[in-house]
């Protein structure tokens, strides 16, 4: 009887990345974690811009045929293909940078072909300058068979199969963080903000149009999710003007690649640099700011910053911790009339004693609008609970995205989402939870309802979830912004009928003791049966 053919293995992105990781680990001269990651991300980038180019050319050919023109005609190709402009962010790639050229290059020439592709891309498009390390592949001098195996594996990744709207470079970056994260710490900038956390921030501050800024932009995830939100509302992503800065060189390159893949125009500066000592967007004000800066960053301070204008009226942040330096930097870049910011910080920033004066000034000047404590274990490289801060330059009311807002000048909304841990992520090496769409929508609705006309801020509360709090109460608590000081906690022990509970426990203990006596008798009988009685 003939054997049945084995079922074809379903392509899985994680399986492909796992294979690439193993090939890179086994390859000689593959370099450090960061060099391995750079090579992998660059290959994925080339794969996806190449596939988008091929899709764009196919659509162009179809359009030409519909008009009775032959796409194979040399004159037609010269007229329509050489200078074709695509409106969806697709690059008109030079021949050397096309994936078909790369995948068909014999193994011995792949290292040179790949670096040539990167050089040509930077020559063709100013937005791609600074994306790549010169000699990424040739300086490593990977064996021909090693680089060929990796390229063939990357060739299996298709945006058609794995989803055009997913942050695929981000997913690859996230995968490599998890697999190679021995040296990847948040202080070094090697941090990837989970999609659900970015979606929560975007859902709350609604960055639909205008200037959007991230002073620690990482891999560009804040920008990507904002664009997704605009598309979901049938909006025009071109009405978002993206500005950002990133200190870490490798992460800066990743952000440029990530945004380029999405066709999102951006202003990330000519190079990577510190937002504190070399603010690339000094003097600019933004409608929206979204950020996940490094938690509790040390080494940020320079004596030249002592009298910096960003600290004026608030106080000098402690040199030992950058949390409040980030807050004041963000505030300095918000549009004075109506700018709004959502950003993440470690929970210690809510009540640190050495920042109490700055915190008091922020609260009294009406800059802090909401404090949201998030569940633990949302992040890849840390399991701590963190806080989402929302600053708003306009708490006096008005119209915002079609909603009539009331005056919240003397109030702050506190939310505690730490109990939202029921959605565990399957298949992770460590426990990890996520926020699902319904939870994100609920959190945003709580915040937006609190802002809106018709809500009584003095009586806006649900125990153990949220509460609107006035300035007087916050002052009585020493200007602490810790939600647990304000949100009511229900003592569930008070709901227990102790008499009934003790009767239940007593009954269970009787059953246990009866079973023990029965077991003891059976044991004694067994020993007697073999002639060894137990006195």
What is each PLM-predicted segment?
Residues 1-208, 267, 271-280, 373-376, ...:
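Non-catalytic, mostly N-terminal accessory regions of nucleic-acid modification and defense proteins
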Residues 140, 162, 216, 244-248, ...:
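Hydrophobic alpha-helical scaffolding
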Residues 66, 367-368, 378-443:
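C-terminal, active-site-flanking charged/polar segments
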Residues 30, 300-321, 346-353, 375-381, ...:
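Short, contiguous acidic/charged loop-to-helix segments that flank catalytic cores in large enzymes
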Residues 187-291, 296-300, 305-313, 325, ...:
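Conserved S-adenosyl-L-methionine
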Residues 19, 32-48, 252, 270, ...:
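Conserved Class I SAM-dependent methyltransferase catalytic core
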Residues 234-239, 337-338, 407-408:
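Short helix-terminating capping/connector loops at secondary-structure junctions
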Residues 53, 230-234, 334:
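Active-site catalytic pocket residues across diverse enzymes, especially alpha/beta-hydrolases
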